[in-house]
């Protein structure tokens, strides 16, 4: 499935449409971590129109799972760093710099 990667919201909307899900149907499948309740269709609409961003890593992972999109792609589009990378211990500034340089090189090869 090809997903519009111009923004987080557009990626969510294009993947949802490719799976033939309504906003209401998708919203029911995305459960908030705090209370296990689904997000509202209005919140989803705001996300799809880039008026709001996902509120947590949990929401990003839920979208990835339901819409069959790589979580890393969604983190990138949301402008977020996955929580598991933020909590890594003993990572030097040199390692971080090298990782970002490799990432930038890979994007240029496109």
Which residues does each predicted region cover?
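DNA major-groove recognition helix of helix-turn-helix
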Residues: 30, 48, 59, 78
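Short, basic-rich loop-to-helix N-cap that marks the start of a DNA-contacting helix
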Residues: 38, 49-65
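Short alpha-helical DNA-recognition segment
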Residues: 20-46
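The DNA-recognition helices of helix-turn-helix-type DNA-binding domains
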Residues: 33-34, 51, 77-82
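A short, Lys/Arg-rich alpha-helix, primarily the initiator
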Residues: 1-21
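Alpha-helical residues within the helix-turn-helix
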Residues: 17, 28, 65
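Interfacial/linker helices and their anchor residues that mediate assembly or domain coupling
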Residues: 78-110
């Amino acid at each position: 499935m090809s997903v519009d990667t111009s923004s987080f919201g557009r990626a969510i909307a294009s993947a949802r449409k490719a799976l033939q899900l309504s906003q209401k149907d998708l919203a029911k499948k995305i459960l908030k971590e705090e209370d296990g309740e689904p997000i509202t269709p209005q919140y989803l609409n705001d996300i799809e129109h880039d008026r709001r961003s996902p509120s947590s890593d949990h929401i990003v992972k839920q979208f990835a799972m339901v819409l069959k999109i790589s979580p890393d792609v969604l983190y990138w589009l949301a402008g977020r760093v996955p929580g598991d990378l933020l909590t890594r211990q003993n990572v030097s500034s040199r390692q971080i710099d090298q990782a970002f340089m490799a990432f930038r090189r890979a994007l240029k090869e496109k």
